[in-house]
From Swiss-Prot:
Localization terms from the record: Cytoplasm
Gene Ontology, cellular component aspect: cytosol
Keywords for this protein: Cytoplasm, Ribosome biogenesis
Record keyword Cytoplasm present: yes
Protein name stated in the entry: Ribosome-binding factor A
HAMAP family according to UniProt: RbfA
Listed SUPFAM superfamilies: Ribosome-binding factor A, RbfA
InterPro entries referenced in this protein's UniProt entry, alphabetically: KH_dom-like_a/b, RbfA, RbfA_dom_sf
Record organism: Herminiimonas arsenicoxydans
Classification via PANTHER family: RIBOSOME-BINDING FACTOR A, CHLOROPLASTIC-RELATED (PTHR33515:SF1)
Task of the protein: One of several proteins that assist in the late maturation steps of the functional core of the 30S ribosomal subunit. Associates with free 30S ribosomal subunits (but not with 30S subunits that are part of 70S ribosomes or polysomes). Required for efficient processing of 16S rRNA. May interact with the 5'-terminal helix region of 16S rRNA.
Length: 128
């Protein structure tokens, strides 16, 4: 289950989780845009009125041009994606989708490397 802010009510969390699951399937199996490669939907944040949804995704590449192309591909396909979501979800207001590259995984890897380097330096200093 995705992490969410505490200000969203329980139903909003369930809607965001369902949108995340459905978006993952739509992007993986139905979206044909060549700009959108292998991505993972990591989190969906829905506004309380369900008018907007911020969709966070990660991808294997850290290349800024590829990320930009992926965001533009997802944004261009947002009408199609919303249509597919509308067929799957039974909510009155279908949110407008805003796609954002999630950098938390890359930051976590960088932090892990820094910790490993600090531990290696500490071990080396202890040996001396």
């Amino acid at each position: 289950m995705a992490k969410h802010s505490k200000s969203i009510p329980g139903r909003g969390l369930r809607v965001a989780d369902q949108i995340q699951r459905d978006l993952s399937e739509i992007v993986a199996f139905e979206l044909k845009d060549p700009r959108v490669g292998m991505i993972t939907i990591t989190e969906v944040q829905v506004t309380p009125d369900y008018a907007h949804a911020k969709v966070f995704f990660t991808m294997l590449s850290d290349n800024k041009d590829e990320i930009k192309n992926t965001v533009s591909g997802l944004s261009a396909a947002s009408g199609y994606i919303r249509g597919q979501l509308g067929r799957r979800l039974s909510i009155h207001t279908l949110p407008e989708l805003h796609f954002v590259h999630d950098t938390s995984t890359a930051r976590g890897i960088e932090m892990s490397k820094l910790i490993d380097e600090a531990n290696a330096t500490r071990a080396k200093d202890a040996e001396d």
